[in-house]
Amino acid sequence: MSLRPFRDIHRKKTKVINVGDVKIGGDNPISVQSMTNTLTTDIQATIKQINDIHEEGADLVRVSCPDEESSLALKEITKHVSVPIIADIHFHYKRAIEAAENGAKCLRINPGNIGDKLKIHDVLSAAKNNDCSIRIGVNAGSLEKDILEKYKEPCPEALVESAQRNIKILEDQDFFNFKISVKSSDIFLSIAAYRQLSKVTDYPLHLGITEAGGFVSGSVKSSIGLGSLLMDGIGDTIRISLSDDPVKEIKIGNEILKSLNLRNRGVKIISCPSCARQAFQVIDTVKILEDKLAHIKTPLTLSIIGCVVNGPGEAAMTDIGITGGGKGNNMLYLSGIQSEKVLSEDIISRVVSEVEKKAAELDKKL
């Protein structure tokens, strides 16, 4: 039994699928993905952005393939990246076949707009022959005409009906290596649709709030929407959609999972907003430490608190902690225990040193 049951999240057990060497669903870690915003035909720019996204901690990267030149470019792109590539396909079934044959490990499609049964059969055959999974991507902005006419507007029931229709299309062709998403730019609609879908299927679910907005608004909307679902135990892979640098999507995605203890990777920093009581410059210190500790992948906790009101209590619950003290004499905590005083000007170097040392110790135990 958990010592802190109020923190427990019981994930729904879903089927397991493979996207390259990444397993999605079941007890596997919730994966984080992003999407390139380069022209896929600009092969060098796309390779660079994929590698930047991967370096930030992405498990998967999606690439748009709007034309033949883009889907064929995957053959060269996949030679120079080590993260599984998902090809984003709309309307033209040949693009999906080309992507599967040229290195994509997953196809993001909506079977309902790919074409007739013969075309869908050809796409699924290419996917099977190339060990390529599929994501059924239902979106409130592109629902089937008859479903929209039935429900009058996008609603949770409409998204779920579209998903179930597309699930049947794949199952009827004996294809089961797929995940599903039911996205909307509306948080309430998205949450309700995913909750309904989770009740009627055990295929893995890809979570996202589509067209969420810029960095601030998009991060907030995604955190509320995805956070609510993840706390319900729903979701096997996530994407934060931002009108910004795709690398930032990975930062936010990993922070959401880290905050919910669903995937601990890297240093989790607990810090105060600072006030007149701070004994050192908390905000500047945190910004510098976030940058200097970005290379640490070992999960551990660090508290940076500017005064003694909450500092000792927070430090007692983290691996490493700094609590502000009078006259620049701040207290360093190691494993929740007071260690020694540290001058304000030495905080950065000392904390970095202690974090790296602690990470090395933990790595040896793994």
Swiss-Prot record:
It comes from the Bacteria. It holds the Pfam family GcpE. Keywords: 4Fe-4S, Iron, Iron-sulfur, Isoprene biosynthesis, Metal-binding, Oxidoreductase. Binds 1 [4Fe-4S] cluster. It is an enzyme of class 1 (oxidoreductase). The keyword Iron-sulfur applies. This is 4-hydroxy-3-methylbut-2-en-1-yl diphosphate synthase (flavodoxin). It catalyses: (2E)-4-hydroxy-3-methylbut-2-enyl diphosphate + oxidized [flavodoxin] + H2O + 2 H(+) = 2-C-methyl-D-erythritol 2,4-cyclic diphosphate + reduced [flavodoxin]. Its cofactor is [4Fe-4S] cluster. Converts 2C-methyl-D-erythritol 2,4-cyclodiphosphate (ME-2,4cPP) into 1-hydroxy-2-methyl-2-(E)-butenyl 4-diphosphate. The keyword Metal-binding applies. It comes from Pelagibacter ubique (strain HTCC1062). [4Fe-4S] cluster binds at C272, C275, C307, E314. Belongs to the IspG family. GO terms for molecular function: 4 iron, 4 sulfur cluster binding; 4-hydroxy-3-methylbut-2-en-1-yl diphosphate synthase activity (ferredoxin); 4-hydroxy-3-methylbut-2-enyl-diphosphate synthase activity (flavodoxin); iron ion binding. Pathway: Isoprenoid biosynthesis; isopentenyl diphosphate biosynthesis via DXP pathway; isopentenyl diphosphate from 1-deoxy-D-xylulose 5-phosphate: step 5/6. Its EC number is 1.17.7.3. GO terms for biological process: isopentenyl diphosphate biosynthetic process, methylerythritol 4-phosphate pathway; terpenoid biosynthetic process.
